[in-house]
Amino acid sequence: MSARDYGFAVDLANTMDWNMTVADFEFNRLLESDGCLMLFDGSIPVGIASCVSFGEIGWFGNFIVKPEYRGRGVGSLLLEYAVNYLRSKGVQTVGLYAYPYLEKYYSKFGFKTVDNAADNGALIVMNNSNVQVNPCSGSSLFKVEQFSAQFDFSVLASFDSAFFGADRSKLLKSLLQEPSNLCYVSFVGEELAGYVLSKDPGGLVEVGSLVCRPDMPDVAFELLRVLFQRLVNRQVVLYLSSNQVVLEAFLLELGFMKSFSLSRMFLGESKIQTGICLAESLERG
């Protein structure tokens, strides 16, 4: 995919109400220059997909083919090309989020659905069209601070990697470099206990990733309260693992609503650990 293809990619993606923008495809190309894919019938663009590699783990997303080309095997070309590309980058496990009705399609390529609590289960897409939140509790058990240059990035990257199962430094660094994005971290003593990120392109705010120690849900709550204080009256979307029932209850109390659910699927062994978490995005895991 090149810059001249962005218009087609955005238009096709948004036939599915994905709220994609040119900036989304620019960012994906920044992370993985060869990972934004276009499929052509001669000179006619007919499909798109994206993939990104994080060491041994890769992620596949933004996969859509024009309706008149579906059922003709062209989507398989995109998917197989993406998997082979990720393999060439050293990826051993490929993850994706799928509409449940597409599980059978992806299973033909070896992807398996994760549906148990130990592996974080399916994904719930939640949204809030007008965020409101009470002031933070100010608990003395832990502190929440906005991430800044004074913090050691390697500590954040290592904490995230222990959960995700691969080094996402290139993603986290790129997100932190954007002034409109927010990141908060929480420490218990001198130990990092959790962090949360939000992406704000100027319209819909995407909250994630969130990663917290599994034994400290209050850290996740406080991180989100602090973040939401900065997002009052904004429209927010986030992606919650279906086994996060305590976090789900917290979000429902804040006025978030469930939009729909997606199936989490892997080609290869999932390395994601159990924890309190929100996905970073649908196209990057």
Model regions and ranges:
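Active-site rim helix/loop that mediates acceptor-substrate recognition in acyltransferases
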Residues: 6, 10-50, 161-183
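Conserved beta-strand in the GNAT
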Residues: 38, 43-52, 59-64, 185, ...
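Conserved acetyl-CoA-binding loop-helix of GNAT-fold acetyltransferases
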Residues: 65, 71-84, 108, 216-229, ...
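Residue-level recognition of the GNAT/N-acetyltransferase active site
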Residues: 66, 70, 99, 212-215, ...
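Conserved GNAT acetyl-CoA-binding A-motif
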Residues: 86-99, 231-242
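Amide-forming acyltransferase catalytic core, primarily the GNAT-like/NAT-type
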Residues: 87, 112-206
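Active-site/acyl-donor-binding loops of N-acyltransferases
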Residues: 97, 104, 112-134, 237-285
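Flexible loop/N-cap segments at domain edges
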Residues: 180-199, 203-243
